[in-house]
């Protein structure tokens, strides 16, 4: 059997479940754990590769904690060893620089809904010659690789969304990073027992993921919602599961902190005044929840 190498807990369930499926077909899958900052070590991939390894799949940027992976380094390693390299770029596309040739990417997948495009449409880039077997058999659409009538309206909507996102990318991402860093600084300096999950610099422009000790993240989300603030206690795919985030577990975060975690995402429309409002609400809400927390009172 062949080996498919990637970091287990941090990958999106779209990748995790696919790997579980091929394992049942007899393929050997190696799962690699990231470092505490959420970044996979190239040395760990190098150690995990077997003589029969044929595919490495690594998420370009994580949807929960925003960490950006060393895609170019992994791509170069894969190319040297004649291993196919796939990256899940759903979060990264239009938010960071991606060059499939320079990064030696063989396959790249992404989705329109992450850049204000329509839901239900995405694309899979495949370097010519990498894959010869059709995914879906039928009428031979998409050069015979994926049969079925194309979603023309979705394709056009995706193209327009991508065009718009790429046109203002430099200005937009720089602004988002300034606002992101401003909010991170305020939260970490003004709210005791708070921590930022993921790397402080190598992260998506608009992503922030905080854990607030002695606070229930779900309750905090409800309080923020009543104040007009949209936030998340995890990925949209696992909302309501009642399970701690597999991403946070992969970086060694204890379950009690996983359940005390809130994710914020900002875009170019968010103002400094709005961030100040969010941080002030956070401070008040967290103080209120900690007053009611027996663990916090015992800790004091």
Where do the model's predicted regions map?
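PLP-dependent enzyme catalytic core of the Aspartate aminotransferase-like
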Residues: 243-300
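Conserved C-terminal alpha-helix-loop-beta "cap" of PLP-dependent enzymes
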Residues: 208-263
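Structural signature of PLP-dependent enzymes
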Residues: 162-185, 195-204
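Active-site phosphate-binding strand-loop segment of PLP-dependent enzymes
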Residues: 30, 34-94
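Short, small-residue-biased leader/transition segments that mark boundaries at the very start
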Residues: 1-6
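Conserved core segment of the aminotransferase class I/II
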Residues: 119-173
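Conserved active-site segment immediately N-terminal to the catalytic lysine
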Residues: 87, 93, 99-116, 133-135
């Amino acid at each position: 059997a062949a080996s498919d190498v990637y970091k287990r807990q941090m990958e999106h369930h779209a990748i995790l479940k696919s790997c579980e499926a091929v394992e049942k077909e007899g393929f050997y899958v190696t799962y690699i754990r990231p470092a505490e900052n959420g970044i996979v070590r190239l040395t760990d991939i190098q150690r995990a590769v077997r003589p029969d390894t044929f595919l490495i799949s690594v998420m370009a940027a994580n949807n929960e904690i925003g960490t950006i992976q060393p895609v170019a380094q992994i791509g170069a390693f894969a190319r040297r060893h004649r291993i196919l390299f796939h990256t899940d770029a759903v979060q990264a596309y239009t938010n960071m620089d991606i060059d499939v040739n320079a990064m030696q990417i063989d396959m790249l997948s992404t989705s329109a809904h992450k850049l204000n495009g329509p839901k239900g449409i995405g694309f899979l880039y495949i370097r010519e010659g990498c894959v010869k077997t059709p995914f879906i058999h039928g009428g031979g659409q998409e050069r015979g690789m994926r049969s079925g009538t194309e979603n023309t309206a979705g394709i056009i909507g995706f193209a327009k969304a991508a065009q718009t996102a790429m046109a203002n990318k430099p200005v937009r991402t720089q602004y988002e990073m300034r606002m992101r860093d401003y909010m991170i600084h305020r939260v970490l300096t003004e709210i005791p027992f708070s921590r930022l999950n993921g790397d402080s610099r190598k992260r998506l422009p608009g992503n922030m993921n905080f854990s607030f000790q002695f606070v229930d993240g779900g309750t905090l989300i409800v309080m923020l919602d009543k104040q007009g603030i949209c936030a998340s206690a995890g990925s949209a795919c696992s909302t309501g599961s009642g399970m701690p985030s597999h991403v946070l577990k992969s970086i060694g975060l204890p379950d009690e902190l996983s359940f005390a975690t809130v994710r914020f995402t900002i875009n170019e429309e968010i103002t400094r005044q709005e961030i100040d409002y969010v941080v002030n609400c956070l401070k008040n809400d967290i103080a209120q929840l900690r007053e009611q927390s027996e663990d916090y009172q015992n800790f004091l």
